[in-house]
Amino acid sequence: MSDTLNQLAEVLEARKNAAPDSSYVASLYHKGLNKILEKVGEESVETILAAKDAAASGDCSELIYETADLWFHSLVMLAALGQHPQAVLDELERRFGLSGHAEKAARPKS
């Protein structure tokens, strides 16, 4: 895993026990999972809108910025639920080389 993701995972874990007024992430943890999920949803919408703008303008700088926000808040969500970013990378690695149809067919039926 990249050094950046590892370092970020360590910081996110450390912020779980920090005072809410000490950092943005600590304040999110203090507000609870629903607030974190709200931020993930907000950043998802902003990323989609930035992609539409990038397609029209050819400038992807805002798309990259918003995608970083989405990834960051997704990592906060994972950490709040006790998951490390490596779990997502492991899942992507598991899927690598599978066709989309084969991956979908292999999913458990619910």
Swiss-Prot record:
Organism domain of life: Bacteria
Keyword Nucleotidyltransferase tagged: no
Pathway given in the UniProt record: Amino-acid biosynthesis; L-histidine biosynthesis; L-histidine from 5-phospho-alpha-D-ribose 1-diphosphate: step 2/9
Record EC number: 3.6.1.31
Subcellular location: Cytoplasm
Reaction equation(s) it catalyzes: 1-(5-phospho-beta-D-ribosyl)-ATP + H2O = 1-(5-phospho-beta-D-ribosyl)-5'-AMP + diphosphate + H(+)
Pfam families: PRA-PH
Protein name from the UniProt record: Phosphoribosyl-ATP pyrophosphatase
Signal sequence segment: none
Enzyme class: hydrolase
Biological processes per GO annotation: L-histidine biosynthetic process
